[in-house]
């Protein structure tokens, strides 16, 4: 009888221990995301999960085609471990609000008027950057954050080294979450013109790189460093910024832009909408982009008139093409095909690329202005992306004709040469 009671007591004790362990595991899952590790397919929108997985396999197999790019990424990530944290609150100038948590920047192409005693109001000199803008450091802090976090997140995904994830999350917390150093989710005082205004909608072009942060969050989801609380608070920040873009005077002003500014406004709206679960808004924006962005910005022969009118016509044409391609990539996430959209008179993303490609490979000369001269290699990432989409066009061959392309160009990792067995992988 005593033996039976003893066995029952032991059994009961074991059940209690196992129950406690199970509860502890559940609580731990509440603190850390239960979304798989770096070996899982990442939640990304502008990047392509299938291609990232292909690159990781190629890295593990020491594929020579991407080794230079992988080595460069590792060097960049190692350097990023010692950078930051970054914050806009460290600037020496205070915005009109009196709050250094508000982003602030000065219009780069505006200079003192030599005919005015005090130089005011500033006047426009397109394409010529006024070094005075560097007195306000917010745009530099933002650029450094975007580059470092993306680099660290990619390195973590490819290698699984938690050091990279930990540093990336540290930078994200400092810039977006820490009450002492966080940025307020608005650009009310971005790109002000001395003597004219305190801020403009055009400043939203400066946050186009935040879409890289959105994908970086997805790459970090499997890490030990990014908690579910972190992720939710980041989503809350982007949700507020998205709403500010939709409701504010500056946001509405940028939405109405008919050039690259309008394109990148849409890219941001869609990316942030997908992050916070507003898929209907993302789909609506993309459907409207057919006419609002592609049909109105691209001519039947592929020219982009509003970009060609600039003093850096090549850079702006290439940059807007990249933005249109980003919209098309985002369209894949919600079933809106912009890659193959074409108006009755032939306006399309493809035509815009085909207009620039002959210049990049040296078959034609650039007939428009470009301060400092064109850089043909800048079109390489777009051509590489097109090689995956338009398989009936020899963009893979054309890429080999673009001069001065760095073998360590990151696009080789983001859009790798897939092996024959993977040619039908999802775009």
Functional labels for PLM-detected ranges:
Residues 13-24:
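Bacterial N-terminal signal peptides
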Residues 25-31:
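Signal peptide processing junction and immediate N-terminal pro/mature segment
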Residues 1-8:
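N-terminal secretory signal peptides that target proteins for export/translocation
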Residues 287-308:
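Flexible internal linker/loop segments at domain or repeat junctions
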Residues 31-254, 263, 287, 298-299, ...:
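Extracellular glycan-targeting catalytic surfaces
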């Amino acid at each position: 009888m005593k033996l039976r009671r003893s066995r029952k007591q032991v059994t009961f004790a074991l059940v209690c221990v196992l129950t406690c362990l199970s509860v502890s595991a559940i609580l731990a899952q509440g603190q850390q995301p239960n979304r798989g590790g770096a070996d899982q397919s990442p939640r990304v929108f502008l990047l392509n999960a299938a291609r990232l997985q292909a690159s990781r396999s190629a890295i593990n197999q020491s594929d020579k085609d991407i080794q230079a790019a992988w080595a460069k990424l590792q060097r960049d990530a190692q350097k990023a471990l010692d950078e930051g944290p970054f914050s806009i609150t460290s600037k020496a100038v205070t915005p009109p609000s009196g709050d250094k948590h508000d982003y602030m920047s000065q219009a780069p192409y505006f200079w003192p008027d030599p005919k005015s005693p005090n130089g005011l109001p500033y006047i426009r000199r397109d394409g010529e950057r006024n070094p005075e803008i560097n007195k306000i450091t917010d745009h530099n802090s933002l650029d450094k954050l975007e580059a470092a976090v993306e680099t660290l997140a990619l390195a973590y995904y490819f290698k699984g080294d938690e050091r990279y994830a930990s540093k990336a999350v540290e930078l994200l917390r400092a810039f977006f979450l820490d009450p002492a150093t966080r940025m307020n989710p608005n650009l009310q005082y971005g790109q002000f013109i001395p003597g004219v205004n305190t801020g403009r909608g055009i400043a939203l072009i400066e946050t186009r790189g935040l879409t890289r942060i959105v994908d970086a969050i997805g790459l970090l989801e499997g890490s030990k460093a990014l908690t579910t609380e972190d992720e939710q608070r980041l989503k809350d920040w982007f949700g507020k910024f998205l709403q500010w873009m939709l409701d504010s005077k500056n946001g509405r002003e940028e939405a109405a832009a008919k050039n690259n500014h309008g394109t990148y406004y849409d890219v941001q709206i869609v990316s942030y909408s997908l992050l916070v679960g507003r898929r209907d808004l993302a789909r609506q924006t993309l459907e409207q982009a057919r006419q609002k962005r592609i049909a109105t910005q691209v001519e039947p022969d592929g020219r982009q008139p509003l970009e060609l009118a600039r003093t850096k016509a090549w850079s702006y044409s290439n940059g807007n093409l990249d933005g249109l391609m980003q919209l098309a990539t985002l369209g894949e996430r919600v079933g809106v095909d912009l890659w193959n959209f074409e108006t009755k008179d032939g306006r399309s993303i493809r035509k815009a690329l085909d207009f620039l490609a002959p210049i990049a490979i040296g078959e034609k000369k650039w007939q428009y202005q470009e301060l400092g001269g064109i850089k043909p290699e800048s079109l390489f990432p777009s051509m590489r992306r097109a090689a995956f989409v338009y398989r009936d066009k020899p963009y893979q061959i054309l890429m080999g004709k673009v001069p001065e392309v760095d073998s360590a160009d990151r696009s080789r990792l983001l859009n790798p040469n897939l092996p024959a067995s993977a040619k039908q992988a999802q775009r």
